[in-house]
Amino acid sequence: MFDVLMYLFETYIHTEAELRVDQDKLEQDLTDAGFDREDIYNALLWLEKLADYQEGLAEPMQLASDPLSMRIYTPEECERLDASCRGFLLFLEQIQVINLETREMVIERVLALDTAEFDLEDLKWVILMVLFNIPGCENAYQQMEELLFEVNEGMLH
């Protein structure tokens, strides 16, 4: 499922391709690209739930809003988000790329993924997807994109 999300993000969203694609055509394109129907369905459902945030149909869990409070992760969250992932989320909060609300959206979307393996690079892409879909997060998206590609470009040299 995560592979489908990455493909969709890179092919349609990140490249600013036509965003209004017929769902049947999209499913057929993904099938033609070699993705499993169940993974396609799950990825589209995942994106639909993300769109609910954008449309105000869903809100992230509201936790303490005191900026000095510390987020305590549940065992399920710790299982999916290792120490490097949790540290990266904290770092992004400290440099104000994400706020308490977007952090909770990211965590909720990460937990909704049906993938056995999840690492820091995967988290960065989920954060990009969430920020892209939330109105008013354009600057945060830009900062996150710069962080993601700056680090990856540095690895190539």
From Swiss-Prot:
Source domain of life: Bacteria
InterPro entries: Smg
HAMAP family xrefs: Smg
NCBIfam families on file: PRK03430.1 (NF002897)
Sequence similarity: Belongs to the Smg family.
Stated name of the protein: Protein Smg
Organism for this UniProt entry: Escherichia coli O6:H1 (strain CFT073 / ATCC 700928 / UPEC)
